């Protein structure tokens, strides 16, 4: 009766406190009804009515959500880093972070043209005082962006974003796919993650609403769906077939979800793949589009790694291009980001989403949802404009831009090859080639003793492996159990982002650690 009642001190009188810390609750008011108690009430009883926040009365969906990319291994890495700064000794002299796709955190240099533009948009006076510091095309782009948002980067933009940037994104999509794109369907977001989360908020209405997610998956999806009160149903990518998908498996997942009484609202498709490092074939994309058109399921096309394709002859194909060529009336939301590719501007939080084949009233509701946060950050919007509209042949910055871009992409290809080749030489390790994105995702054949030891610790065996790799070798990776995997299999995700000299260290440390670890559990 009283569990949710907040006491008003003016309506409560207490007797004297005795040694037993009891108070006599004389009167209080509840719902306009005066009640009287004459018995003593222990203070702990009074405290139970308090509104003080504890771990037990916060949103339990947040408490039970998992996000392995910044989970237990990373928390321990932060502890080690702090201990090292205080002088504590470890078997290594530095940590090698291979856990998250955050390029500039591990020494990737930013693209000069972008930084020149952002410097000017943040401090326009510097261009007046020292124009010689900047390339002419950077000066011109900054001038255009400042004019497009009155007040500059320190002022709110329109909810959907600076109109010029939305228009430039639409032109970029039209050029990429060869089909029209309406700027009214473009929404600029704080990274792709916000766009994905807000789209999920829009779609999930009831506890029985379901999103299909790939396994292995990027845990943004499972965590967000859980917190927003929906359900997810896995569809498995086939490791034996280069992490390709099978249309029959998607259809089985749809049937499985519906058999549970769930309403399948959407399917998440990540291409190129995180964590797999693989690209969907055109046939894979066609299969998803056809199924979704037939079943009235929204496609959530996570395409943030579209510039990260390494296999010779491969080229990115968007879901919008395929469904348009097939003349399918699918409902599609596609996402892109400034954080990946060769830009690596994670901290700028630039992103966009495009809604395709949604009615205007639904689009208006997404606009309202985004309006609650006013707009995405304007520096991120400017970054997006530069990313989708970089220097062109003949521009003053073009030669330097091409040199920087190709240098980054070529280096990523080399590092991907070097790391995957080294991993395949380890006993019990199988690593498919890295054809896209920023990760190797290797499979571990665990000794039975290792699996048993992990069970005794209450941990997944690949989590135990990653914790040992961190504590003994200083390499920070993410266990496959955090992405989902077929029962009885174990995986580890490592980025390919450490610079070349550190990739060599990663290879050496992992090689030495792995040999000792496997010998320990043979």
Model-derived features: positions:
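N-terminal mitochondrial targeting presequence
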Residues: 21-53
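N-terminal "arm"/small-domain region of PLP-dependent enzymes with the aminotransferase-like
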Residues: 48-160, 171, 297, 381, ...
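Conserved core segment of the aminotransferase class I/II
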Residues: 49-51, 55, 113-116, 136-144, ...
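Conserved PLP-binding catalytic core of the aspartate aminotransferase-like
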Residues: 56, 104-107, 112, 401-413, ...
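Generic structural signal for small/hydrophobic residues in well-ordered secondary structure
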Residues: 73, 98, 169, 186, ...
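Short beta-strand
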Residues: 88-89, 95-97, 335, 430-435, ...
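Conserved PLP-binding active-site segment of the aspartate aminotransferase-like
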Residues: 99, 438-457, 473-507
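Conserved core of the PLP fold type I
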Residues: 112, 118-294, 306-329, 333-334, ...
């Amino acid at each position: 009766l009283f569990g949710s009642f907040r006491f008003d001190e003016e309506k409560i009188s207490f007797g004297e406190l005795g040694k037993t810390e009891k108070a006599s609750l004389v009167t209080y008011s509840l719902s306009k009804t005066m009640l009287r108690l004459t018995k003593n009430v222990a203070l702990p009883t009074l405290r139970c009515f308090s509104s003080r926040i504890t771990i037990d009365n916060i949103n339990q969906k947040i408490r039970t959500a998992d996000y392995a990319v910044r989970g237990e291994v990373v928390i321990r890495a932060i502890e080690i880093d702090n201990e090292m700064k205080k002088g504590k000794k470890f078997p290594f002299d530095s940590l090698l972070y291979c856990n998250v796709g955050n390029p500039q955190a591990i020494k990737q240099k930013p693209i000069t043209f972008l930084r020149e533009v952002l410097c000017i948009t943040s401090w326009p006076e510097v261009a007046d005082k020292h124009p010689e510091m900047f390339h002419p095309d950077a000066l011109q782009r900054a001038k255009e962006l400042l004019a497009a948002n009155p007040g500059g980067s320190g002022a709110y933009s329109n909810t959907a974003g600076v109109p010029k940037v939305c228009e430039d994104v639409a032109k970029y999509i039209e050029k990429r796919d060869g089909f029209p794109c309406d700027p009214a369907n473009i929404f600029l977001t704080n990274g792709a993650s916000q766009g994905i989360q807000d789209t999920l908020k829009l779609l999930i209405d009831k506890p029985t609403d379901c999103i299909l997610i790939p396994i292995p998956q990027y845990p943004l999806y499972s965590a967000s769906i859980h917190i927003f009160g929906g359900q997810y149903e896995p569809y498995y990518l086939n490791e034996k077939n280069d992490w390709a998908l099978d249309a029959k498996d998607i259809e089985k997942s749809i049937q499985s979800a519906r058999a549970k009484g769930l309403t399948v609202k959407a399917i998440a498709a990540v291409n190129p793949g995180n964590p797999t490092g693989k690209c969907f074939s055109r046939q894979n994309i066609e299969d998803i589009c056809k199924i979704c058109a037939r079943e009235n399921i929204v496609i959530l096309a996570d395409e943030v790694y579209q510039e990260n394709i390494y296999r010779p002859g491969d080229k990115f194909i968007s879901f919008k291009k395929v469904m348009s060529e097939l003349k399918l009336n699918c409902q599609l939301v596609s996402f892109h980001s400034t954080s990946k590719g060769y830009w690596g501007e994670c901290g700028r939080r630039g992103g966009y989403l495009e809604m395709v084949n949604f009615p205007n009233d639904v689009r208006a509701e997404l606009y309202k949802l985004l309006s609650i946060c006013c707009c995405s950050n304007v520096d991120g919007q400017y970054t997006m404009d530069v990313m989708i509209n970089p220097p062109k042949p003949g521009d003053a910055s073009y030669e330097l831009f091409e040199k920087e871009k190709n240098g980054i992409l070529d280096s990523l290809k080399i590092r991907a090859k070097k790391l995957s080749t080294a991993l395949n030489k380890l006993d019990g390790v199988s690593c498919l080639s890295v054809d896209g994105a920023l990760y190797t995702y290797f499979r571990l054949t665990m000794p039975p003793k290792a699996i048993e030891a992990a069970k005794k610790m209450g941990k997944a065996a690949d989590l135990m492996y990653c914790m040992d790799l961190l504590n003994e070798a200083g390499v920070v990776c993410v266990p496959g159990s955090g992405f989902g995997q077929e029962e009885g299999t174990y995986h580890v995700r490592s980025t390919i982002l450490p610079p070349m000299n550190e990739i060599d260290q990663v290879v050496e440390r992992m090689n030495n650690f792995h040999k000792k670890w496997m010998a320990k559990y043979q």
